[in-house]
Curated annotation (Swiss-Prot):
Organismal lineage: Bacteria, Pseudomonadati, Pseudomonadota, Gammaproteobacteria, Enterobacterales
Binding site for NADP(+): R11, G12, M13, V14, T38, S39, Q75, S167, G168, Q352
Residues annotated for phosphate binding in this entry: R104, K246
Catalytic activity reported: L-aspartate 4-semialdehyde + phosphate + NADP(+) = 4-phospho-L-aspartate + NADPH + H(+)
Family as reported in the entry's similarity comment: Belongs to the aspartate-semialdehyde dehydrogenase family.
Protein name (database record): Aspartate-semialdehyde dehydrogenase
Source species: Buchnera aphidicola subsp. Schizaphis graminum (strain Sg)
């Protein structure tokens, strides 16, 4: 029987990417979709396959939600916190698929990334688990790149430095970044065409503008354009940011590892728009040749691609501009460190709105539709 699927939060960045991917893969032909809204119930919904979806449902109407076989939400944590307990307390037996972090670490929830943990997902389904949550964006992208090493139990620990896109913070932050860029350009646009101006004169104007009271800072609170922000999410008692804490906590839950893999690092916001990049220092638990490491990585899933460690291939393939709006997971700069042959460095890039957010949700929906 074709399943009824309630879709909530489809207007945001993750939700919009999800709808786009579902149309590309003809997923709507397999379900009966119902579009919900927290603010515009009764109005027109999205256009799917050139057909306008009419009469949006009220996303706070528990009775309507309970009629769904599956609910997939990209509405955010506050919505999940308000609605999910009410549904479960009313004995709703449907499947809940969620992009928000609220339920990730709950015992009765499974973090989904099926190219990496399909066995964990299937075991959860066999046990009657009905709550499935997308992972943290950097964690999911790391596992898509390093999955072969993880599933073959070759890693002792990982230290990661992230270079995270503005979109990871939300659409308002992307807009603010672009406004910051525009503001800086506007103050020097004429100077850039005047050869009498030195670079230092231009730099001074840019710096002064970024420090001015009129500079757009409502969301980031500090400049990101021409700068970076070495802190993401709230502060933990041990000195980590919560974003850094998620690396170890979520990875071990996703893989359901018996022996915990230690993961730590520093998470940094940069002025990329969609793609997160990550630099890894990996301690292997045995000495494996670099060629075997490459084979293990590339054989893990169809999306990961090992980029040869040379300048030209790296510049062409291992950047946010090359990867944005694709499902590609390039990994490069692979080399053994001079510290010891069991130490490996690597660098990877991935679109945080695709494998980092929407794609695992879409694929989980398809797993449930085919049950």
């Amino acid at each position: 029987m074709t399943k009824s699927v309630g879709i909530i939060g489809w207007r945001g960045m993750v939700g919009s990417v999800l709808l786009k991917r579902m149309q590309e893969e003809n997923d709507f032909s397999k379900i009966i979709p119902y579009f919900f809204s927290t603010s515009q119930s009764g109005q027109d919904g999205p256009i799917i396959n050139n057909i306008l979806s009419k009469n949006l449902k009220d996303a706070y109407n528990i009775n309507l939600l309970q009629e769904m076989d599956i609910i997939i939400t990209c509405q955010g944590s506050s919505y999940t916190e308000k609605i999910y307990p009410k549904l479960r307390n009313n004995n709703w037996q449907g499947y809940w698929i969620d992009a928000a972090s609220t339920l990730r670490m709950e015992k009765d929830a499974t973090i989904i990334l099926d190219p990496v943990n399909l066995n964990v997902i299937n075991n959860a389904l066999d046990k009657g688990i009905k709550t499935f949550v997308g992972g943290n964006c950097t964690v999911s992208l790391m596992l898509m790149a390093l999955g072969g090493l993880f599933v073959n139990n070759l890693i002792d620990w990982v230290f990661v430095s992230t270079y995270q896109a503005a979109s990871g913070a939300g659409s308002r932050y992307v807009i603010e970044l672009l406004k910051q860029m525009g503001s800086l350009y506007n103050v020097v646009s004429k100077d850039l065409l005047d050869k009498s101006y030195s670079v230092l004169d231009i730099e001074k104007k840019v710096t002064q503008e970024s420090r001015s009271k009129n500079f757009p800072l409502e969301n980031f609170s500090v400049p990101l354009a021409t700068s970076l922000i070495p802190w993401i999410d709230v502060e933990m008692k041990n000195g980590q940011s919560r974003e850094e804490w998620k690396g170890q906590a979520e990875t071990n839950k996703i893989l359901n590892l018996k022996k915990k893999v230690l993961i730590d690092g520093t998470c940094v916001r940069i002025s990329s728009i969609r793609c997160h990049s990550q630099s890894f220092l990996i301690k292997l638990n045995k000495d494996i040749s670099l060629e075997n490491i490459k084979k293990i990585i590339v054989n893990h899933n169809q999306w990961v691609d090992v980029i040869p460690n040379n300048m030209q291939k790296t510049l062409c393939n291992l950047t946010p501009s090359a990867v944005t709006d694709t499902l590609n997971i390039p990994i490069g700069r692979l080399r053994k460190l001079n510290i010891d042959d069991r130490y490996l460095s690597a660098f990877t890039v991935g679109d945080q709105l695709l494998w980092g957010a929407a794609e695992p949700l879409r694929r989980m929906l398809n797993l449930l539709v085919n049950i």
